[in-house]
Amino acid sequence: MDQIQKVAFQRVFKTPGVKNQVADIAKKASWTPLLSAADGTKVTCSPNLNAPETTPGEERTFGDGNEVVGGIPISLGSSPTEFAAVIRRQPQSVIAQLKKMMCEEVGVYIFDINGMIGCLADNPSNPTKYEPIPIFSMFVGDYSFGGYDGTGSNNISWKFKPNWSDNLVFVKPQDFNPLTDLVNPDSDSSSEI
């Protein structure tokens, strides 16, 4: 997957205990009802994401020297993966809508520069259902003035749990480009929420 350009947010659970899943994620017809939904299945597309950076979690360890056998640290797993980007030149009403998701249990479908969709699958080698990648500690920052040589912007960031990518798959859409064809209802463009 290449540069992330947009994401689609969706609640992880459509109802308590029942995960959101899409059977045929490669067809636009699967997305259309999700964009206009008024329940827990609703999908909301982000504006364009600039300067996206993903920092994979580093190993967490315990001990050294005489504290552990042979002085070899004990591996405890990994820390979360961090994602950060910048949203430029968007009305603050769009940003306010994104901020409402900061206290929701949401996930993301990732759209790259080539229109590929990144998401989780029930079985990565033979997927039958796809779901959003859960995110945590979502943050949407206040407006930053751009100055003479820049543009106004808002920072956005979140974390993925350790091992988040174990069931990650990349899907090529069959009849649409998610960057241009998935538009939030009542929007003049795909960059508005």
Model-predicted regions and their roles:
Residues V69-I95, D149-D166:
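Oligomerization/assembly interface segments of phage tail-like spikes and tubes
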Residues Q3, I25, G40, L49-A51, ...:
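Short linear motifs in intrinsically disordered/low-complexity regions
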Residues K129-I193:
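Mixed-charge, glycine-accented linear interaction segment located at domain edges/termini
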Residues I95-K129:
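Short, acidic/charged, Gly/Pro-enriched secondary-structure junctions
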Residues M1-A84, I133-G150:
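Solvent-exposed edge beta-strands and adjacent loop segments
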Residues V7-Q10, F83-I87, E104-G115:
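Short, hydrophobic/proline-enriched secondary-structure or compact coil segments at domain edges
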